Amino acid sequence: MSFKDLRSFIDHLEANGELKRISYPVDPHLEMTEIADRVLRAKGPALLFENPKNHHMPVLANLFGTPKRVAMALGKDDPLALREVGELLAFLKEPEPPRGFKDAIAKIPMFKQALNMPPKTVRNPPCQQIIKTGDEVDLTQLPIQHCWPGDVAPLVTWGLTITKGPRKSRQNLGIYRQQLLGKNKLIMRWLSHRGGALDFADFKEQFPGERYPVVVALGADPVTILGAVTPVPDSMSEYAFAGLLRGERTEVCKALSCDLEVPATSEIILEGYIDPEELAEEGPYGDHTGYYNETDKFPVFTVTHITQRKDAIYHSTYTGRPPDEPAMLGVALNEVFVPILRKQYPEIVDFYLPPEGCSYRMAVISIRKQYPGHAKRVMMGAWSFLRQFMYTKFIVIVDEDVNCRDWQDVIWAITTRMDPKRDTVMIENTPIDYLDFASPVAGLGSKMGLDATNKWEGETNREWGTPIVMDPKVKQKIDSIWDELGIDDSPTL
């Protein structure tokens, strides 16, 4: 099942008991965050606040608050099915040459599908049913959440920022938080390595002093949103990838103020520009780390046009100490990364980004160890293979007999298979998340790798321990007589 717009997905969630409408008046200032946080921690439904205080536009929250709903957005029933998305990405990133004529014929449909998914331009799009320009532009009329008591101002969180570099043929879609600065101004917090910031830097170099056109889409269809947070190959647009996932081309329309293309079924579109000379102090804001972050200067986005659907819905979220919605999204996308990593490192059995580690700051990887030093090779490869792991501070490597998603198993492996000095890798002066105030310098810090695998000859001079395992025949016998023993609640082994 594919969803052409956000509304059809909302209907689907409601029909399946995955969305709750709240008619009671709730304030976007702090109250929505408290409600959404309680519901998310209870693994509850998406929320549609129908009567936000002092506003006339409903607010959608917790849309991707469980891995199940992320899978549902892509037409899947189980988050594990998201590995199919990872397999597609692994193929697109590094397609294998055909092994023969029959294999070449078999691969033609996939190549053809990938090539036939450019966005489809439509006229009279829903996102331009209402148009506001000039003095009509007033961002304060949107029910933008003020998430935490220490936040400096309301914050746009789920906007798809659309940019294009002067040397690129495709547009870039990225999600960057945006501080409300005034009726027609937002602060665009994009870090220097992100796609939008790179496009902006290229534009400034080629057209110094000129205004840079930018568009932000709020409430796009769920597949396009997820396409924007997935590690799409640099040569492919997020629109094309969303079309592949959907099985239908992504419908777009031309913005009114520039040549950028926007998702045609979006609820709200913000059009405008960035003046390269206009910067503003951004923050502080409560973030996914569970702390308020430092302030810094970022470009100001001036909004010249607001277009929207009739009866538009404002899509929002909050970030805070995990679990939050981005953490749940990270749990689901974890399944996407597994096939991508296995493509490069077939010895990887499983890969896990614990949500309590902010979904990217720690990774645990299980491998089929084949030679001394193998664990160190895999940890170095993981750090360098995908940009998404550039900020991963800790990597733990375990053997295939250890469940890398079970902390009891992982801690057992660390405490019984590691010597702290021999099996710890420390790397200094590496890229670190700017929000990580624990690093000695903003954006630069160290990484730690833990080799918690069994040690081979050459890694140790001692006889290695043999794990204790019960005789399978005895286990089978006890299983067969368990009910007769009169012991309640047999543990699952």
Curated annotation (Swiss-Prot):
Mn(2+) binds at N172, E238. It is found in: Cell membrane. This is 3-octaprenyl-4-hydroxybenzoate carboxy-lyase. Catalyzes the decarboxylation of 3-octaprenyl-4-hydroxy benzoate to 2-octaprenylphenol, an intermediate step in ubiquinone biosynthesis. It is a peripheral membrane protein. It comes from Shewanella sp. (strain W3-18-1). Prenylated FMN binds at I175, Y176, R177, R189, W190, L191, R194, G195. Transmembrane segments: none annotated. GO terms for cellular component: cytosol; plasma membrane. Homohexamer. It comes from the Bacteria. It is an enzyme of class 4 (lyase). Pfam families: UbiD (PF01977), UbiD_C (PF20696), UbiD_N (PF20695). Keywords: Cell membrane, Decarboxylase, Flavoprotein, FMN, Lyase, Manganese, Membrane, Metal-binding, Ubiquinone biosynthesis.
